[in-house]
Amino acid sequence: MASDALIGALVSVVGAANVLVDADVQAGYETDWTGRFHGSARCVVRPAGIDEVVGVLRACSAVAAAVVPQGGNTGLVGGGVPRGGEVVLSLRRLHAIAPVDAQHGEVVVGAGAVLGAVRAVARAAGWDVGVDMASRDTATIGGMVSTNAGGVHVVRYGSMRNQVLGLEAVLADGTVVGRIPGLRKDNTGYDLTGLLTGSEGTLAVVTRVHLALVAYLPDRVVALCALAGLADALTVGGALRKTLDSLFALEVFFADGLALVSEQTGLGLPFDRSYPAYLLVECAGRASSAGLLVDALAGALGECPQVQATAVAVDAASRERLWAYRERHTEAINAAGIPHKLDVTLPFDRLVEFERAVRARLDEVAPRSRVVCFGHLGDGNLHVNILGPPPDDFAVDDAVLRLVAAMGGSISAEHGIGVAKRAALERSARPADLAAMRAVKRALDPREILNPGVLLASTGAVSS
């Protein structure tokens, strides 16, 4: 439990109802949603606006108390949960969504606004959010900015960094930085917005975000293609990227993952037999364009002899069913146990080799494990999920990440570094790059108040 002095200071800022010190109430903030990462919080503070965030950080900074910013707690690398006695700064009450600028396609939202809610507001105004993911009903915009989240539409719109026009954030000492509203073009000095995007709450606490929206494309066509393996999926995916202007998503999964989804959710299989690999393709267009989308997709797939079977869906219910085979992977994996979740990117020409090599390597280091891979094929991004090894067996993670580094890949495509991949980052990044990162951390948070031990190793400058 926090000291009386700090508790009193925090209560004076946000009120007693929003300083949580009861262990049972804190529990939901102390464990990530996979159940793999957990710790104990000094207390949980729930500010409702930027002035309260400023007050909380000033109070914590005054006594050198470490702070862990937390959004929807849907992260997968342990970056948003306490490690041992930090103050958890929950941003869920900063959920305001301003009216959409319907003429220019922009909106300002609070860091605690949930993606699904922002998307609904945007669509009502004829616009959409360029990033989407299965956790849309719990993931917050602030958390997505802090991890530079990706998702299923990166192939079309890019990651979260591409959607952010400006942001407002608070440094560890309570200083407010950033610009709201942001501008489409602004080359005045260093790109602070770009720096804070993807910084995992280690440099500042994001409080508001100015998003650039994309046109809402209501007509969708989804195809699920059965293939002989990842090599064929890459061939087909490359052809579709060249020929389909309407391409909206390009996702890959495998027979073992589909079997697990069916086993855990009861979802029937899409074809009358199993195939080694599956490519889910979505095309999108403006109203009354479904027929054109179907024709274009059918024509493009017709030029791909690698496709062994296809299911095509136009109506919403059928589209959702095909998407369920991909999106329910995470649900099925979590239902089967506490997974090791690794999120990596490989050069396209190394993906096939990696997919084979990672399974072989895991057979060596964790012979009784169950390996499920799926991912965003258009970005070279695979999610490697390992079931079976104990949650604290980081040798399993290490084996995969060493393989990724050896093949010229990235150990984090969209989930961030957190605590889970910190050692791998220190091992695989250039020493000069790490030195530059540490210099930035020292400049913006010299006392290591914000998320110590996340992304970079802590020097132990703060109290917990």
Give the location of each predicted region:
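N-terminal accessory segments
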Residues: 1-33, 63-65, 300-318, 406-411, ...
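Short, ordered loop/turn segments at secondary-structure junctions
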Residues: 24, 71-74, 94, 134, ...
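C-terminal substrate-recognition/cap domain of FAD-linked oxidoreductases
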Residues: 22-29, 211-215, 221-399, 403, ...
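Active-site cofactor/substrate anionic-group-binding motifs, chiefly glycine-
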Residues: 64-69, 74-79
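FAD-binding subdomain of flavoenzyme oxidoreductases
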Residues: 96-251, 450
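Activity-critical C-terminal alpha-helical subdomain
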Residues: 175, 422-464
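N-terminal flexible segment immediately upstream of the FAD-binding catalytic core
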Residues: 1-58, 75-105, 257-268, 315-343, ...
